[in-house]
Swiss-Prot record:
Protein name: NAD(P)H-quinone oxidoreductase subunit K, chloroplastic
Gene: ndhK
GO molecular function annotation: 4 iron, 4 sulfur cluster binding; iron ion binding; NADH dehydrogenase (ubiquinone) activity; quinone binding
Function of the protein: NDH shuttles electrons from NAD(P)H:plastoquinone, via FMN and iron-sulfur (Fe-S) centers, to quinones in the photosynthetic chain and possibly in a chloroplast respiratory chain. The immediate electron acceptor for the enzyme in this species is believed to be plastoquinone. Couples the redox reaction to proton translocation, and thus conserves the redox energy in a proton gradient.
Organism of derivation: Huperzia lucidula (Shining clubmoss)
One annotated GO biological process: aerobic respiration
Assigned GO CC terms: chloroplast thylakoid membrane; respiratory chain complex I
Length: 263
């Protein structure tokens, strides 16, 4: 209520001049409709919205790309503003950023870490070596030609190595994908229903390392051949070396190599 004093001589006029003024704050509350005060959504959308700012990445680096991904923790990139909290345990991580070359011996460990992560989980393939094998993809027998062979990949991030700004852009694209997920898509992407892009066409061969390599006939040299290979002067008549700088001491066993004693 607001008092407006027009005439101070008459009390009746003062009382009649009292006029009610509508409170604007109360009117806004009264004018609000149900659609503006209550948000109607589904549990799936609410779950996606809650997970957008809580993607916890797993620290997994095997090569130089990990140096760029580790720089996200610094103040220059400030990955905390996106809710990225690096974790060392796969059971507390939602995202794994594979940074570096994946070898044949390291692939089973990567699959084991991926299986220990709770659903839903995501993978970002960072760097050329992770996506296609990089410079090791042509003549290397121990490099996996793409991390999407053992585990599924959600976002591919090419580069050698990618900059921290590119990693943030990949995370933003992953957030958009998480926001559009549905329950049917989560069921379809379960481990039992996943289909990988391609498989390796490697074949197993027999092991030729039997330990008999040093005992083959091609590896047996006579003294003359051995000394000529070493380019040391040798007198075949006296069966001795020329010069006093180096003296050779024959071994007791014939199969043992010649011992060299330097003064």
């Amino acid at each position: 209520m607001v008092l407006v004093y027009k005439y101070f001589s008459c009390e009746n006029e003062i009382e009649n001049s009292i006029k009610p003024v509508i409170n604007l704050m109360e009117s806004s509350l009264l004018d609000k409709t149900t659609s503006n005060s209550i948000v109607l959504t589904t549990f799936n959308d609410f779950s996606n919205w809650a997970r957008l700012s809580s993607l916890w990445p797993l620290l997994y680096g095997t090569s130089c790309c990990f140096i760029e991904s580790a720089s996200l923790i610094g103040s220059r990139s400030d990955s905390d503003r996106y809710g990225l909290v690096p974790r060392s345990s796969p059971r507390q991580a939602d995202l794994v950023i594979t940074a570096g070359t994946v070898t044949m011996k390291m692939a089973p460990s990567l699959v084991r870490l991926y299986e220990q992560m709770p659903e839903p989980k995501y993978v970002i393939a960072m760097g050329a070596c992770t996506i296609t094998g990089g410079m090791f993809s042509t003549d290397s027998y121990s490099t996996v030609r793409g991390v999407d062979k053992p585990i599924p990949v959600d976002v591919y991030l090419p580069g050698c190595p990618p900059k921290p700004e590119a990693i943030i852009d990949a995370i933003v694209k992953l957030r958009k994908r998480v926001a559009q997920e549905t329950y049917e898509s989560k069921i379809r992407l379960k481990p039992g229903n996943r289909f990988f892009t391609s498989i390796h066409q490697f074949r197993f061969v027999s092991n030729n390392l039997t330990g008999e390599y040093s005992k083959q006939s091609l590896r047996q040299f006579t003294k003359t051949e051995l000394y000529s290979t070493l380019e040391v002067p040798f007198d075949e008549t006296t069966d001795e070396y020329k010069g006093s700088a180096v003296s050779f001491q024959e071994s007791m066993d014939e199969g043992d190599p010649v011992a060299i004693d330097k003064p």
